[in-house]
Amino acid sequence: NGYSYQGTIIWKYMALTRQGTARTSQQSYANWIFYRYPEILLMKAEALIQKGTQADLQAAYALIMQVRSRANALESDETDFSGIINADELEQFLLDERARELMFEGKRWYDVLRFARRNNYAKIDYLMDLALNSAPTGKQQSLQSKYGDHRSHYWPIHDDELKSNQSLVQNTFYETSTTIKK
């Protein structure tokens, strides 16, 4: 049939229908959606949290709950933000909700990095803990060393791009001693 899968597949990307079969490589014509409406709501909530007034925090909370309601998410103690809302706690709740809502969409690293970088890397420990907890024991020291250098948080620009565009400059973490001929 042109494909084989072992284990679990991410059905929202592979399915033809809810109960149907997975797409074959010849049927890979999916219209990839980069921004879904729930993500737009969560982006707005993040912006409101950054504004920081209680009215903005209440509005941000309402947007997060709108996303959760649409997804039929279970209620828990962590979803109760009645009364005065703490901006840091709501921001963490938002980050967790983005992880749940946008799972497998390739956005988590950028969410965590944006969260960690805010206010001059005030929350770099969050990024470091997340990375170290998911790394094998033998890789943790090198990972800690690499991520400790803030310049490493973005990929290098490919050599072909540097050669074709004279205005581009390599990300400093990935500069080499050899000169790239443009």
Model-inferred region functions:
Residues 1-182:
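Acidic/polar-rich alpha-helix caps and helix-coil junctions
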